[in-house]
């Protein structure tokens, strides 16, 4: 008879399980896309969740063409200010390095407070050879009453598409000092990858952190503990052993999240729930509805990018029948 075996509890794919350095998530890779030149990412602030009634667009579903209720996450997406752009080229080892940097004029003073070195950047012509183009954008925190921080977050977004990198450079030059909106990035019916920092849970025990089984009822001293720290040799505790420690506040990427709806700031009454969203308030700017849940607490910065591993095709539109505006306060 074979020896019964259970696969290890807790994935090693998420090591080290430590707190993220910043609440600002980092997009470390960008997919190659075809078509017209466009920005490959965007950012917003998580508001909360509600539910909608829509026509099931999945052709092979048993409810295809019928109204279904689905949960959605509301993300407030005010326009982003394009404050600069960068050109990258490959070094001898194949790594991308910055070869040129340009900044817009008449920037907000908050930008200089976060990056004072901007004033020292000399104006010069871009080089002839470069491999990648990325714009530098800043969030408009002052326009979002629901979040406490009023300092803008500054980060890069890749420019993709087109027939050459020169077209991407022209796109960056034309948008320098202007604003981009969510429609410049995506639209309802398409997929996006969501990158954010998860909710922090603090220091938690073995069972909650790894899902290991409780020890028998008659075990001495504790039950919510692992049975062993490992063998006698090797004579150290290996990192594969489940132990108590930090849980949450870690960067995670959710792939292939469908965009259900986009609305501008004139249409916020169609999404603001009665009494406001818990721990956030009312949406005042452009917003998007994303299918299902996404990582992070309300008010947290959420970044989106083009899907890296899209498996099903986009659809032209999502037919919404009803958006729940009932209070989320339990009354």
UniProtKB/Swiss-Prot annotation:
<dbReference type="InterPro" id="IPR045077">
    <property type="entry name" value="L3_arc_euk"/>
</dbReference>
<keyword id="KW-0687">Ribonucleoprotein</keyword>
<dbReference type="InterPro" id="IPR044892">
    <property type="entry name" value="Ribosomal_L3_dom_3_arc_sf"/>
</dbReference>
<protein>
    <recommendedName>
        <fullName>Large ribosomal subunit protein uL3</fullName>
    </recommendedName>
</protein>
<dbReference type="InterPro" id="IPR009000">
    <property type="entry name" value="Transl_B-barrel_sf"/>
</dbReference>
<dbReference type="GO" id="GO:0022625">
    <property type="term" value="C:cytosolic large ribosomal subunit"/>
</dbReference>
<comment type="similarity">
    <text>Belongs to the universal ribosomal protein uL3 family.</text>
</comment>
<keyword id="KW-0689">Ribosomal protein</keyword>
<dbReference type="Pfam" id="PF00297">
    <property type="entry name" value="Ribosomal_L3"/>
</dbReference>
<comment type="subunit">
    <text>Part of the 50S ribosomal subunit. Forms a cluster with proteins L14 and L24e.</text>
</comment>
<dbReference type="GO" id="GO:0003735">
    <property type="term" value="F:structural constituent of ribosome"/>
</dbReference>
<dbReference type="InterPro" id="IPR000597">
    <property type="entry name" value="Ribosomal_uL3"/>
</dbReference>
<dbReference type="InterPro" id="IPR019928">
    <property type="entry name" value="Ribosomal_uL3_arc"/>
</dbReference>
<keyword id="KW-0699">rRNA-binding</keyword>
<dbReference type="GO" id="GO:0019843">
    <property type="term" value="F:rRNA binding"/>
</dbReference>
<comment type="function">
    <text>One of the primary rRNA binding proteins, it binds directly near the 3'-end of the 23S rRNA, where it nucleates assembly of the 50S subunit.</text>
</comment>
<dbReference type="GO" id="GO:0006412">
    <property type="term" value="P:translation"/>
</dbReference>
<keyword id="KW-0694">RNA-binding</keyword>
């Amino acid at each position: 008879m074979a020896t019964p075996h259970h696969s290890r509890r807790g994935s090693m794919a998420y090591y080290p399980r430590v707190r993220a350095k910043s609440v600002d998530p980092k997009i470390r890779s960008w997919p190659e896309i075809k078509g017209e030149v466009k920005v490959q990412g965007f950012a917003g602030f998580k508001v909360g969740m509600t539910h909608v009634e829509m026509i099931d667009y999945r052709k092979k579903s048993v409810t295809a063409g019928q109204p279904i209720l689905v949960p959605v996450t509301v993300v407030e997406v005010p326009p982003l200010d394009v404050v600069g752009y960068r050109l990258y080229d490959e070094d001898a080892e194949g790594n991308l390095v910055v070869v040129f940097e340009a900044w817009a004029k008449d920037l907000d003073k908050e930008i200089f407070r976060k990056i004072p070195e901007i004033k020292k950047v000399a104006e010069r012509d871009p080089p002839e050879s470069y491999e990648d183009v990325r714009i530098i954008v800043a969030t408009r925190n002052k326009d979002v009453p629901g979040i406490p921080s009023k300092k803008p977050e500054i980060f890069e977004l890749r420019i993709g598409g087109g027939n050459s990198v020169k077209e991407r450079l022209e796109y960056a030059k034309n948008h320098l000092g202007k604003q981009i909106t969510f429609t410049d990035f995506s639209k309802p019916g398409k997929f996006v990858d969501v990158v954010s920092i998860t909710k922090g849970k603090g220091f938690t025990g073995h069972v909650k952190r790894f899902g290991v089984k409780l020890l028998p009822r008659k075990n001495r001293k504790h039950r919510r503990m692992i049975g062993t720290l490992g063998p006698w040799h090797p004579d150290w505790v290996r990192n594969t052993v489940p132990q108590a420690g930090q849980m949450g506040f870690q960067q995670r990427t959710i792939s292939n999240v469908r965009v259900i709806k986009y609305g501008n700031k004139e249409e916020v009454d169609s999404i603001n729930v009665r009494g406001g969203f818990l721990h956030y308030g009312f949406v005042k700017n452009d917003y998007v509805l994303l299918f299902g849940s996404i990582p992070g607490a309300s008010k947290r910065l959420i970044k989106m990018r083009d899907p890296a591993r899209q498996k099903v095709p986009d659809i032209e539109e999502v037919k919404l029948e009803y958006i729940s505006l009932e209070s989320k306060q339990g009354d």
